[in-house]
Amino acid sequence: MKIYTIIGGVNGVGKSSLTGVLAAESNDLGVIIDTDKITAALGGDRIRGGKEAIKRINNSLKMGINLTQETTLSGSRTLKTIKKARELDYFIRLYYIGVNSADESIKRIKNRVEKGGHDIPEQDVKRRYNKRFEDLANILPYCNEVKLYDNENGFVEKAEYRNGELLTKNKDVPEWIKSLKQYKENPSQNPEATPPGFLHETESA
């Protein structure tokens, strides 16, 4: 079985860390495509890094090998890749990570920068955070397996999405998953709806 694994979540939630955990536990992640590492290797040029990441994804799909991608899910690129992978009979697996506030993501990004990591403008973080449920909802119908992890205090699997339903693991449900469930039930009433003009994104983790 060919597997396309997506490590999703807004900026600063710990996508690379979860990839590391999963890689230590499993041998089916295949080629791991980390746009930030690719960009760093290209001298920090994010445009070149993004293009190279897309090239590696497309090559992996063409070769029919397992691949793993870290993404904020913003923009239309991930959905296009998922649809292409499905046409090629890939099993689509999504591990989505969340935290309860944009401020928490921003704090973690600042901590990352202090350790030599890459920065993300605060306005971009907040915009993507406010639009996260819409971005997630767009790809859920195309995924064969979805697990949702809370990362307030280490990675804990809190829910899964199956047969069109969001199923929580126990009574200790994070606020962001409660909000996601409300959004799924009534998207038009989303209290965190994206302001006009913020519909198109350039990927950046």
Residue positions per predicted region:
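Pre-Walker A (Motif I) flank of P-loop NTPase domains
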Residues: 1-4, 64-65
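Hydrophobic anchor at the beta1->P-loop junction of P-loop NTPases
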Residues: 7
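P-loop (Walker A) phosphate-binding loop of NTP-binding proteins
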Residues: 10
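Conserved glycine(s) of the Walker
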Residues: 14
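Conserved substrate/cofactor phosphate-moiety recognition/catalytic segment
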Residues: 17-67
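Short, glycine-rich nucleotide/cofactor-binding loops
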Residues: 69-74
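NTP-dependent small-molecule kinase module
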Residues: 139-205
